[in-house]
Amino acid sequence: MPVGGLLPLFSSPAGGGLGGGLGGGLGGGGGGGGRKGSGPSAFRLTEKFVLLLVFSAFITLCFGAIFFLPDSSKLLSGVLFHSSPALQPAADHKPGPGARAEDAADGRARPGEEGAPGDPAAALEDNLARIRENHERALMEAKETLQKLPEEIQRDILMEKEKVAQDQMSNRMGFRLPPVYLVPLIGAIDREPADAAVREKRAKIKEMMKHAWNNYKLYAWGKNELKPVSKGGHSSSLFGNIKGATIVDALDTLFIMKMKNEFEEAKAWVEEHLNFNVNAEVSVFEVNIRFIGGLISAYYLSGEEIFRKKAVELGVKLLPAFYTPSGIPWALLNIKSGIGRNWPWASGGSSILAEFGTLHLEFIHLSYLSGNPFFAEKVMNIRKVLNNLEKPQGLYPNYLNPNSGQWGQYHVSVGGLGDSFYEYLLKAWLMSDKTDLEAKKMYFDAIKAIETHLIRKSRNGLTYIAEWKGGLLEHKMGHLTCFAGGMFALGADDAPDGLTQHYLQLGAEIARTCHESYSRTFVKLGPEAFRFDGGVEAIATRQNEKYYILRPEVVETYLYMWRLTHDPKYRKWAWEAVEALEKHCRVNGGYSGLRDVYVSAQTYDDVQQSFFLAETLKYLYLIFSDDDLLPLEHWIFNTEAHPLPVLSRNIKKVEDNEK
């Protein structure tokens, strides 16, 4: 979908704060991306760079000639003194009619006073020393530039252009954001379920949320996460020095569960303490889905302006991650210096498909909320790069080099490293009110290839999604992959060639397999990964795959299958998960992950993940709520379960009518 097709949603009133300022400053009258105007009188940066080199060489030649002149003070006086009024003696250094007014005005020191230049010859020598120093520096910079490869010079120019664009955007952050049309909140507040048993179960899940929140507040308030066993704060390196991940991640869950007092104290913390002006290297992916996603969702649900302001502020901070030759963003970014890099373990310095492919929903909303298409252009460029690449067997490898714009190692997974890329293709189509036809095509082409090359059945009929490594299958499925059952079902209604029932059935089969991975453990919660080889089915065989960290993907699929089929087994399976969490993960200080789901003697990992409040408990609560709470036709969940409204094709018409 061309960015131009999105632009009507992102317009803002003329001169309207960030939107108006950025629309002119960065959009370049429609050029976008901070480009200069393309007229005959405008030089490109590359042309300016060449002219600068020529000019530097000319200046070097002129100053170099001075050093070969005879050492005559009179000659040098003639060359320098007459061309430099600052070095000429004053007409009169005594107060009175003969004194120069500009000397008094600009505070210049006079001879005989402290700080005066004194002897003209000494001043001349100082001046020549500065000239030599500047001359040597210019030569050194020119030499370093000429030694660079052409692509390095182009990269420097690109980064400088992007830096200028970001500086312009940052300078406008002090302006008020333009007014936006708030989508009517359909299903943000619900009624109690009519069935008493369902109502009781939902109340229990709300009590679990209170237990998790109250202990976080008691022992780790303002920290990123809670250590529920040792009762202290925990902070992952994913967030750098940014604080409050649990607070931001939990905002919309608190709102949906009508925990009004807790929501207000969370909002107050965001207003007073959430600070992005820190020297912090962060995961662009994690900060986007948790912080930006959480803030945007809280804004749409509550209408509180502070959440929009903070979301756009952080979005601007993440823009330097895109300053690569291909526009594929870095995985890690120092949000103060703007320096990015990739994970050292990633294939050939590559970016990760699931990370750069999971920015789309949030950045489209950032453009809508800021009134500027700059954010949308960044993620649409990612799609352009991907569409220009050959896909092995129609599959998307997990690694893409941001410098070359080419694939790294051919490793394909619908679990870790790849998962949410496919999720966001489908959800981009749905969130656009089904106008983003490019996203729809990419999604169905991708899952067709996945079904052909990755989906298999075990000897006993369990459907699973294997991993593809250079053409060879590894018969392993991760807990993260279990989200795919819900994805297949959610996209089934728009499937081509009468495949709707097929994809609903595929979703049900994946849900069953993931339920089996839970049922075959002692604690009835699933391992991080499970295998289908050597006679083993849906069981973890390696010690480093037996842990459970309060992950949500299985109950996420239960939610979609319940909403789309109303088969009661999904509520039954969800309640089994609730009982297992209460029995094995609940401790006095909150909820903890487990190191081994196959043993009775529990060893806790002592971390209450922020996504437990953002995702796991939210999905469980929604399973036991009526369908009119966050209905799927009006709300799209980002990969951290933050609900974002569908951007209706009629929004622009409504805005225009209200004006």
Curated annotation (Swiss-Prot):
Pathway: Protein modification; protein glycosylation. The active site is at residue 528. InterPro entries: 6hp_glycosidase-like_sf, Glyco_hydro_47, Glycosyl_Hydrolase_47, Seven-hairpin_glycosidases. One of its GO terms (cellular component) is endoplasmic reticulum membrane. GO terms for biological process: carbohydrate metabolic process; ERAD pathway; protein glycosylation. Residues 88-121 are annotated as: Disordered. It catalyses: N(4)-(alpha-D-Man-(1->2)-alpha-D-Man-(1->2)-alpha-D-Man-(1->3)-[alpha-D-Man-(1->2)-alpha-D-Man-(1->3)-[alpha-D-Man-(1->2)-alpha-D-Man-(1->6)]-alpha-D-Man-(1->6)]-beta-D-Man-(1->4)-beta-D-GlcNAc-(1->4)-beta-D-GlcNAc)-L-asparaginyl-[protein] (N-glucan mannose isomer 9A1,2,3B1,2,3) + 4 H2O = N(4)-(alpha-D-Man-(1->3)-[alpha-D-Man-(1->3)-[alpha-D-Man-(1->6)]-alpha-D-Man-(1->6)]-beta-D-Man-(1->4)-beta-D-GlcNAc-(1->4)-beta-D-GlcNAc)-L-asparaginyl-[protein] (N-glucan mannose isomer 5A1,2) + 4 beta-D-mannose; N(4)-(alpha-D-Man-(1->2)-alpha-D-Man-(1->2)-alpha-D-Man-(1->3)-[alpha-D-Man-(1->3)-[alpha-D-Man-(1->2)-alpha-D-Man-(1->6)]-alpha-D-Man-(1->6)]-beta-D-Man-(1->4)-beta-D-GlcNAc-(1->4)-beta-D-GlcNAc)-L-asparaginyl-[protein] (N-glucan mannose isomer 8A1,2,3B1,3) + 3 H2O = N(4)-(alpha-D-Man-(1->3)-[alpha-D-Man-(1->3)-[alpha-D-Man-(1->6)]-alpha-D-Man-(1->6)]-beta-D-Man-(1->4)-beta-D-GlcNAc-(1->4)-beta-D-GlcNAc)-L-asparaginyl-[protein] (N-glucan mannose isomer 5A1,2) + 3 beta-D-mannose. Its EC number is 3.2.1.113. Residues 70-659 are lumenal. Disulfide bonds join 482-514. It is found in: Endoplasmic reticulum membrane. It is a single-pass type II membrane protein. Inhibited by both 1-deoxymannojirimycin and kifunensine. The chain crosses the membrane at residues 49-69. It holds the Pfam family Glyco_hydro_47. Ca(2+) binds at residue 639. Residues 1-48 are cytoplasmic. GO terms for molecular function: calcium ion binding; mannosyl-oligosaccharide 1,2-alpha-mannosidase activity. Coiled coil: none annotated. Its cofactor is Ca(2+). The keyword Hydrolase applies. Keywords: Calcium, Disulfide bond, Endoplasmic reticulum, Glycosidase, Hydrolase, Membrane, Metal-binding, Signal-anchor, Transmembrane, Transmembrane helix. Involved in the maturation of Asn-linked oligosaccharides. Progressively trim alpha-1,2-linked mannose residues from Man(9)GlcNAc(2) to produce Man(5)GlcNAc(2). Belongs to the glycosyl hydrolase 47 family. This is Mannosyl-oligosaccharide 1,2-alpha-mannosidase IA. The lineage of its organism: Eukaryota, Metazoa, Chordata, Craniata, Vertebrata.
